[in-house]
Amino acid sequence: MSELNKLAAGEWYQFKAAEVAAQKARAAKLCQEFNQIDATNPDAQTAKIQEILGSYGRNLSVQAGFNCDNGRNIHVGDNFLSNYNLTILDIAPVHIGDNVMIGPNVDIYTVNHPLMASGRRANLAQGHPVTIGHDVWIGGRAVITPGVTIGNNVVIAAGAVVTHDMPDNTLVAGVPAKVIRQLE
């Protein structure tokens, strides 16, 4: 089984394998091109980010400083807005719903590495999808970890580290993040 097939199946794979590295190199090149586009040319920015993403809805707005591992695994809905320096390590799929706003310096991770040093020395990794619902606001410097599902109408406070699923209609904060209160 190829390393990309292992990755797609959610199995441990060699993250330094040539086929995996080629995906990352493609994404790195496209992200570099996107990040060099003049901010006064939003049409060029939109065209380049559309080339990077797997799928996207209407009214897409992504600020410079965007980085990803693959790009094709990122799927965003309508009215998506991200501020500066969004990093999405999309080894596994990342699905983001409609009307989502992401603050500056947010990190979304789908990749995990072994706890045992022997597995890390063997360059092993494993992907776990991330799903973000509709009408979500993610505050600046928040971190979303592998395998997390965030419900609809959720506000994630700045600096939160989300390590487990979050239900609909909640305000989430802290390290690790927890539900602070219900939203109406």
Protein language model features and the residues they cover:
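Terminal amphipathic alpha-helical/low-complexity segments used for targeting or macromolecular assembly
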Residues: 1-59, 177-180
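Flexible, glycine/small-residue-enriched loop-and-beta-strand segment within the central core
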Residues: 39, 66-76, 81-149, 175-176, ...
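Short-chain dehydrogenase/reductase
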Residues: 137, 155, 171-173
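Acidic, glycine-centered active-site loop in nucleotide-sugar glycosyltransferases
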Residues: 166-168, 173-176
